[in-house]
């Protein structure tokens, strides 16, 4: 399945790539190797993390093929040009930045590529820790990945909807966020941030490790209504989303 791919690896990561992509393979290896210790430390992970394989592809068709055949994940064909990566267990398929112009809606920006890979690595660590990844609400998993990768801090794709919603006093309820995919990305990270602020990092870790049925609120000792009220009041605090002080991964 990967017969024509070259390999660049260290003890923790294996990057598979095609000829001409060595630059991006090196970049990916460096990003992942630097990020994993920070992520595992955040989640208080003491056991060694399994070796991770990332496959860089240069065409949308190859991306779809490997997501389907290597990862065994159902995917629309052709997949949406906004889709750049897909993790599953300890494998991830990533559209190479060299293919962005032809096969995506994005322009390659090194810092955004870094945050994308960290986002996917957070999903991988969560999957290793959680009792049932499929039961985890999308807003929680995506919120966690957007928050810890700090995409929310720098990228309008993740940040603008929340900022605009707050400015216009148009904040969705939890039921809407749970029901709509785009809202999970737009607002999930704000809920994760609130949980970390209100309960501490240990509660984030506890939710990931204990939430087997998808009921995040139960682990928190809250109802959806009570948490939504507290979150809404918190998020409306003056300057909340523009604050640059937080505990988590650091921009480098």
What is each of the regions a protein language model found here?
Residues 2-133, 137, 215-219:
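Juxtacatalytic substrate-recognition/specificity segment
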Residues 83-90, 112-116, 124, 128-252:
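Acidic/His/Gly-enriched intrinsically disordered linker/tail segments
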């Amino acid at each position: 399945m990967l017969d024509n791919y070259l390999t660049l690896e260290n003890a923790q990561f294996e990057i598979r790539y095609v000829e001409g992509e060595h630059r991006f393979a090196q970049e990916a290896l460096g990003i992942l190797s630097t990020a994993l210790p920070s992520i595992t430390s955040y989640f208080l992970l003491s056991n060694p993390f399994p070796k991770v394989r990332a496959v860089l592809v240069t065409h949308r068709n190859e991306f779809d093929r490997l997501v389907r055949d290597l990862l065994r994940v159902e995917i629309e064909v052709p997949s949406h040009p906004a889709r750049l990566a897909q993790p599953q267990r300890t494998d991830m398929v990533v559209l190479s930045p060299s293919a962005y112009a032809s096969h995506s809606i994005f322009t390659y920006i090194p810092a955004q590529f870094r945050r994308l890979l960290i986002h996917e690595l957070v999903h991988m660590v969560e999957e290793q820790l959680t009792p049932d990844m499929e039961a985890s609400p999308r807003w929680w998993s995506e919120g966690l990945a957007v928050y810890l990768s700090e995409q929310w801090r720098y990228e309008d794709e993740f940040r603008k909807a929340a900022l605009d919603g707050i400015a216009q006093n148009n904040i969705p309820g939890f039921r809407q966020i749970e029901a709509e995919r785009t809202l999970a990305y737009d607002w999930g990270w704000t809920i994760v941030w609130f949980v970390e602020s209100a309960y501490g990092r240990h509660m984030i870790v506890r939710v990931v490790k204990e939430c087997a049925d998808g009921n995040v609120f139960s682990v928190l000792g809250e109802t959806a209504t009570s948490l939504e009220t507290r979150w809404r009041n918190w998020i409306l605090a003056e300057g909340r989303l523009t604050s640059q002080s937080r505990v988590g991964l650091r921009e480098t």
